[in-house]
A protein has these predicted regions:
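Outer membrane beta-barrel
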Residues: 39-192, 202-207, 211-216, 229, ...
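Inter-helical turn/loop segments and adjacent helix faces that build the functional surface
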Residues: 194-198
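N-terminal periplasmic/intermembrane-space "pro-region" immediately following the signal or transit peptide
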Residues: 18-58, 377
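Outer-membrane beta-barrel pore domains
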Residues: 24-30, 65-72, 108-110, 119-123, ...
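Bacterial N-terminal signal peptides
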Residues: 8-15
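Positively charged n-region of N-terminal signal peptides that target proteins for export
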Residues: 1-4
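Short, well-ordered amphipathic alpha-helices
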Residues: 35-39, 206-214, 332-336, 372-375
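Generic detector of N-terminal low-structure segments
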Residues: 16-18, 281
């Protein structure tokens, strides 16, 4: 524990020492570098007016420990995500996007894992957007946030317990805004196949979201409130055993912002076949400068079923295997530095997690630290 705390303090102190105000020529350099992903652009070409590369590369060092006897700890460097693909604008208003998840840690296995975003989309004149294909299914605060734009190192434990652990599903969605009310509706296959061969063979689910910014009512820059609804049906196929425990889930998301202060929340509930789950996430953060940000996040989940809550990615990967309980609490402290917005950033996080089993005994209690670079294009 002492080594972990010292390491965290050293890294956080070092990151504070690197805080600088970016100059205009630095921004210009970043602009020139990122402009290189556009391989073709010609607005007069009615067939294909633009073609550019997309992707993300996320590397990190993490150190986690479980103090519950027998105590165990683990630290390692890891390529968290590597995705690569393209986007093309066709026939003026149609977008074709395809991206693959590639495993740089796939030792002895193929580099290719699966497709993530692979869809076509188009918009009407009034701003209604349709999307068909494999796409992100947005639900809960962090579940509706791209991994490129997370303010924490990982999605919250609400996203992993109230919502599916998987993000991309084959389906169709429509989104837009009407009379200042944002809306989203999606219908998806709940399969976990790498491409499209399992689409709608095991079951399906739907998502409906409505949101509105009430900034004028509260005299703030942003006061956004959103309700998410998810309903699912499946045939109990073992191929989708990660998802067939859900009947429905609901989420109330708020985003309060003013000047350099932010306060985002998520209150969620899942109707699961083996016990209901509710969760609360409170996430205030503050911009120290236009490039540097401090963040705190409190998350708590409680389950009426025995031992169906799970820890995060690295907590679960300690040598003793997966940890399960029915009462889960996490405190997260973070420091982010944005060199080029979310496209190039350095993130640091220190977290404390406690997971209790149904009988009251501790399943997991310990600290974790992660420092990471996130690049996207």
């Amino acid at each position: 524990m002492k080594k972990l705390t010292v390491l965290a303090c050293m890294c956080l102190s070092f990151s504070f020492s690197q805080i600088i105000n970016a100059q205009e020529d630095q921004e210009s350099t970043f602009d020139k570098i990122w402009d290189n992903v556009v391989l073709y652009e010609n607005v007069e070409n009615s067939l294909m007016s633009k073609f550019w590369l997309t992707g993300r590369l996320q590397g990190e060092y993490h150190s986690f420990e479980n103090e519950v006897a027998p105590a165990i700890d683990h630290d390692d460097y890891d390529w968290r995500r590597f995705r690569f693909g393209f986007k093309a604008t066709l026939f003026g208003d149609i977008t074709l996007h395809s991206e693959a998840d590639l495993g740089l840690e796939n030792r002895g296995r193929p580099l290719y894992n699966d497709l993530t975003d692979t869809y076509i989309s188009w918009s009407t004149e009034n701003g209604m957007k349709f999307k068909l294909g494999k796409q992100s299914a947005p639900f809960t605060l962090d579940g509706s946030t791209s991994s490129k734009k997370l303010h924490t190192l990982e999605r919250s434990k609400i996203a992993g317990n109230i919502w599916f652990g998987q993000e991309y599903f084959p389906g169709i969605s429509v989104s837009g805004s009407k009379d200042e009310i944002d809306y989203f509706a999606g219908f998806y296959s709940n399969d976990n196949k790498p491409e499209f061969d399992g689409a709608f063979k095991h079951g399906q689910f739907g998502i409906l979201s409505v949101g509105k910014d009430y900034a004028g009512n509260f005299d703030l820059e942003k006061s956004y409130l959103r309700l998410d609804f998810m309903f699912q049906e499946d045939d109990g196929n073992d191929d989708v055993e990660d998802f067939n425990d859900w009947n429905a889930a609901y989420s109330f998301v708020t985003k309060w912002e003013n000047n350099d202060w932010y306060f985002w929340t998520d209150l969620s509930f899942a109707d699961r076949k083996n016990g209901d789950v509710w969760g609360l996430q409170l996430m205030p953060f503050y911009d120290i400068t236009d490039k540097t940000q401090v963040i705190f996040c409190y998350t708590h989940l409680d389950s009426s079923g025995d031992n169906q809550l799970r820890g995060s990615r690295w907590e679960d990967r300690l040598d003793r295997g997966e940890y399960r309980g029915d009462d889960l609490t996490e405190y997260f402290f973070g420091l982010n530095h944005f060199f080029y917005g979310h496209k190039l950033k350095w993130q640091n996080g220190l977290q404390y997690t406690q997971l209790d089993e149904a009988d009251g005994s501790k399943e997991y209690e310990g600290w974790g630290f992660t420092t990471a670079f996130r690049i996207s294009w």
